[in-house]
């Protein structure tokens, strides 16, 4: 691993990756951690939110436009000034160029940088189907790199009920829950 960091990814756009990324960046900054942010792909809007939260520029890393060596060089640039990096994925975890190729996906970026993935799942309106969805994602590629899940738009009670199920049936750690807006 080049540097301590993680990729926040999701099954699809609209899952709350940007909100969760900004909340995580703010929490790390509040704990006086020297954190920096990246966005996978060419998106320029989300990096502006990252910068607003942490006060330092957020950079783009795109495995379609840049080769593996250049990606590692860009990620490693100025790393001694930071203790941790958070990379926000784009679209779904495996959605690269045109939504059909691995190149350009958050997964490909995590592979290239040898980083773990934390999956953000919008669990609103789901019960056990959420476990089936996660199981499918985990089985799709055995090198999924997923170490944990953040459930977005759900309740504390639901998470208390589902945490043992997720941990026992999937071997995943439930890292955080984000409540539904009222």
Task: Label the model's feature ranges.
Residues 2-15, 19, 25-113, 121-148, ...:
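ATP-dependent carboxylate-amine ligase catalytic core
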Residues 40, 154, 181:
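Hydrophobic pocket-lining residues within nucleotide cofactor-binding pockets
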Residues 75-76, 164-165, 178:
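Short, surface-exposed amphipathic charged segments that create phosphate/polyanion-binding patches used
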Residues 117-120, 175:
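Short hydrophobic alpha-helical runs that function as membrane-insertion/retention elements
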Residues 147, 173-176:
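Residue-level detection of beta-strand scaffold positions
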Residues 153-170:
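GTPase G-domain guanine-specificity segment
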Residues 176-182:
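Conserved small/polar residues in nucleotide/adenosyl-binding loops
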């Amino acid at each position: 691993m080049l540097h301590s960091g993680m990729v926040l990814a999701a099954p699809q756009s609209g899952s709350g990756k940007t909100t969760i990324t900004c909340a995580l960046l703010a929490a790390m900054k509040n704990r006086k951690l020297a954190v920096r942010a990246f966005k996978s792909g060419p998106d320029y809007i989300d990096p502006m939110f990252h910068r607003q939260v942490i006060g330092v520029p957020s950079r783009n890393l795109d495995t379609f436009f840049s080769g593996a060596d250049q990606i590692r060089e860009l990620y490693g640039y100025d790393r001694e000034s930071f203790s941790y990096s958070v990379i926000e994925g784009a679209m779904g975890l495996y959605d690269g160029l045109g939504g059909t190729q691995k190149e350009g996906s958050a997964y490909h970026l995590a592979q290239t940088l040898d980083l773990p993935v934390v999956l953000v799942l919008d669990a609103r309106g789901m019960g056990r189907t959420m476990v089936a969805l996660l199981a499918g994602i985990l089985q799709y590629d055995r090198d999924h790199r997923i170490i944990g899940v953040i459930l977005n738009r759900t309740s504390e009670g639901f998470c208390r009920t589902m945490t043992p199920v997720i941990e026992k049936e999937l071997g995943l750690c439930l890292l955080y829950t984000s409540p539904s807006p009222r």
